[in-house]
Amino acid sequence: METTADVSMDVQPERLKNLLKALVDIYSPSGKEEGIVEYVGGYLKDNGLDFIKQKVDENRFNLVVLPKNEEEVDLCFVGHLDTVTAHDLENYGFSEEGDTVSGLGTADMKAGCAAMIEAFTVLVEKGGVLPPVGLALVVGEEEESDGAKTLMREYSFPWAVVGEPTDMVPCLGHYGYLEVLLRTKGKRAHSSMPELGQNAIETMLKLLLKVTEYITSMPKGVVYNIRQLSGFPGGFVVPDNCEAWLDLHLHPDSRVDVLKAELEQLVEAVDESALGLEAYIRFENTQSGYRISPKRPLVKKLKEVYKKLSLPWEPQDFRSHSDGNVLWAAGVDPIILGPGRLETAHTAEESVDFSQVVQAARLYLNFALSINAPFTRKP
């Protein structure tokens, strides 16, 4: 196959929409992706795309499409087939109104997966031989990224495009992520006599206030979310235990280790200053952010594709965490780029403009065709 763009090669919007509808209509929360993996495997086979089923656990698999020479993968397109759980199990499927298509996973990221699959379908139906690019459709991103971690244990490639929703803006920077557990202990008492106890929830609220005040005062800023707050035990008592889970998203240039140390010092100071209060902090999940130089040769190729398709080139940072963090930690340079807007993901109003899904498929296709020389990670 020629590895330069062929004007006769183009995506088929109707086929792409049918694929996206099928993907959205299959419920595939993290850990329960068997149905969608089976469907996508059949779709790839029917369209002439040979794939490898990579085992993640007993019943879950990644799907990996590689060129004939597996050692020649210079760029891998990566998408996750799982979603968060549905807000409404009776009403999560595909719907459309005008150019807008809605449903669980439309933005995050079944539209991106469908666009990637369509691009690869065009590649094989026109020439039969893939350029030095791969496609990895993984599971588990919304929980522990176990699909991406398994992928990186067996395969190696220098570059990736991860199809998270960026509104088609190329993200060369990626926020880091810190999952934080805070725990406070108080003194249990009868609920009608709170003065005899120490309410662990009240002390947690005071601790959270100090933590969030510190976070918002940081010069580069940290995006924080108090994800969960729970008091124990239940019943008619003053709770003597409280846990809070926080998601912290850090600017790409932030030092995760510095933030950890300062949070530990803050909690230690609160613990020492409050009579009877026991405060505890633990970091459950740490993912470093990163930034890719726009001067890298492959990034310049992507910029040329944007110019060819008359798309604005305005690189930004991706401010969530994703499989991109996992790939980066494994030595890959991941560019985050896909259809849809991050602000609609994980909401009951999740949607994407279908015209943008078509645009994504065309961009992925043209970018894949432009890859005709090896690219290695800068030392």
Where are these regions (language model features)?
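Metal-dependent amide/peptide-bond hydrolase catalytic core
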Residues: 1-5, 11, 165, 181-379
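Acidic, glycine-rich active-site loops and adjacent beta-strand->loop/helix elements
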Residues: 81, 100, 136-145, 165-167, ...
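Residue-level signal for inorganic ion chemistry
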Residues: 23, 27, 44, 164, ...
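Acidic-glycine-rich active-site phosphate/pyrophosphate-binding loop
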Residues: 82-97, 172-183, 301-304
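Acidic/histidine-rich catalytic neighborhood of metal-dependent amide-processing enzymes
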Residues: 110, 114-179, 378-379
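A short glycine/serine-rich beta->alpha loop
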Residues: 98-107, 189-191, 232
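Acidic/His- and Gly-rich active-site-bordering loop/insert found
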Residues: 2-104, 128-129, 324, 341
